UniProtKB/Swiss-Prot annotation:
This is NADH-ubiquinone oxidoreductase chain 2. It is a multi-pass membrane protein. Core subunit of the mitochondrial membrane respiratory chain NADH dehydrogenase (Complex I) which catalyzes electron transfer from NADH through the respiratory chain, using ubiquinone as an electron acceptor. Essential for the catalytic activity and assembly of complex I. Belongs to the complex I subunit 2 family. InterPro entries: Complex_I_Subunit_2, NADH_DH_su2_C, NADH_UbQ_OxRdtase_chain2, ND/Mrp_TM. Core subunit of respiratory chain NADH dehydrogenase (Complex I) which is composed of 45 different subunits. Interacts with TMEM242. PANTHER family: NADH-UBIQUINONE OXIDOREDUCTASE CHAIN 2. It catalyses: a ubiquinone + NADH + 5 H(+)(in) = a ubiquinol + NAD(+) + 4 H(+)(out). It comes from Myosorex kihaulei. GO terms for cellular component: mitochondrial inner membrane. It is found in: Mitochondrion inner membrane. Its EC number is 7.1.1.2. The gene is MT-ND2.
Length: 347
């Protein structure tokens, strides 16, 4: 793909998300989603292969279906309210359809089936955009209309997403699929707290993007896509292998790393609102996620698979990826738990 065309597509994706973030008119929000989808499809197929074409087709069909449901909901809402403003949600059927459309775009269970398949079929760069930037727009719309969403429906989807995100990642050997199931579980945590404290959802989203970006950048640096190739990284970059281990544990939510902060704050907020069964269930299901992160950590850092070459790579095979952003990203992904009291006061 021509680099200029690729830059134009990325700018279109950013523009589509920006339109959604700044609009209070439903038609402009729908238009932003369409711009985002149409620009994302060529990005998914940047490195053309039959698998990438299949992934792009699955992405298009899912997103187009969600957009169709969203437009149907907007027309129903217009019939009953006579307005296009985002704050004026008066019809329960329209609210239900909008929730279904947004959760499809977000990849929440039970509409999660496209996320692992699409992520596995594309490059690491496209997978990073899909699992981070593309989550911002649906969550931003849900943030604005959370008062109109059925809380029982959203909490059921959230709990189901945490459960499926944990179970789905247990038997995976492909790193992109593992990160996709991790994304489903994290989206479940975010939507669970949205009804009680939407600002906490934004903090959770920020930390999730930081940790996921750190992991994908380390995967790209080492050109690893499977657990087997990940287990051989100690031979090339021993320091980065240790950093990868801590970032993985942070994604799993193990204290005293950054990833423990959002889980701690969400459980604290839920118990403060007299909810006991929900945070207990979420904490138990989070252990499944932590288990497959621990398994990845074990195969990455605590085992040394037999290899013929125990020396560093030859100069002509040295990796040329830039690592300027990795240091601050890894630091933020692992070491900002002490700032938790400040964030609790802010939210």
């Amino acid at each position: 793909m021509n680099p200029l065309i690729f830059i134009m597509l990325i700018l279109t994706i950013i523009l589509g998300t920006s339109i959604i973030l700044t609009s209070t008119h439903w038609f402009m929000i729908w238009l932003g989603f369409e711009m985002n989808m149409m620009a994302m499809i060529p990005v998914l197929m940047k490195k053309y292969s039959p698998r990438a074409a299949e992934a792009a087709t699955k992405y298009f069909l899912t997103q187009a279906t969600a957009s169709m449901i969203l437009m149907l909901a907007l027309i129903i809402n217009l019939m009953y309210s006579g307005q296009w403003t985002i704050m004026n949600m008066t019809n329960n059927m329209a609210s239900l359809l909008i929730t279904i459309a947004l959760t499809m775009k977000l990849g929440l269970a039970p509409f999660h089936f496209w996320v692992p398949e699409v992520t596995q079929g594309v490059s690491l760069q496209a997978g990073l955009i899909l699992l981070t930037w593309q989550k911002i727009a649906p969550l931003a719309v849900m943030y604005q209309i959370f008062a109109s969403i059925n809380p029982n429906l959203l909490l059921t989807m959230a709990l189901l997403s945490i459960m499926i995100g944990g179970w789905g990642g247990l038997n995976q050997t492909q790193l992109r699929k593992i990160m996709a199931y991790s994304s489903i579980a994290h989206m479940g945590w975010m939507t669970a707290i949205m009804i009680y404290n939407p600002n906490l959802m934004l903090l959770n989203l920020l930390l999730y993007i930081l940790m996921t970006t750190s992991m994908f950048m380390m995967f790209m640096y080492n050109s690893t896509t499977t657990t087997l190739s990940l287990s051989l990284t100690w031979n090339k970059t021993p320091l980065m292998t240790v950093l990868m281990m801590t970032t993985l544990l942070s994604l799993g939510g193990l204290p005293p790393l950054t990833g423990f902060m959002p889980k701690w704050m969400i459980i604290h907020e839920l118990t403060k609102n007299n909810s006991v069964i929900l945070p207990t269930s979420m904490a138990i299901l989070a252990l499944i996620n932590l288990f497959f992160y621990m398994r990845l950590t074990y195969s990455t850092s605590l085992t040394m698979f037999p290899t013929i070459n125990n020396m560093k790579m030859k100069w002509q095979f040295q990796n040329t990826h830039h690592t300027t952003l990795l240091a601050p990203l890894i630091t933020l992904s692992t070491l900002i738990l002490p700032l938790t009291p400040m964030f609790i006061l802010m939210t």
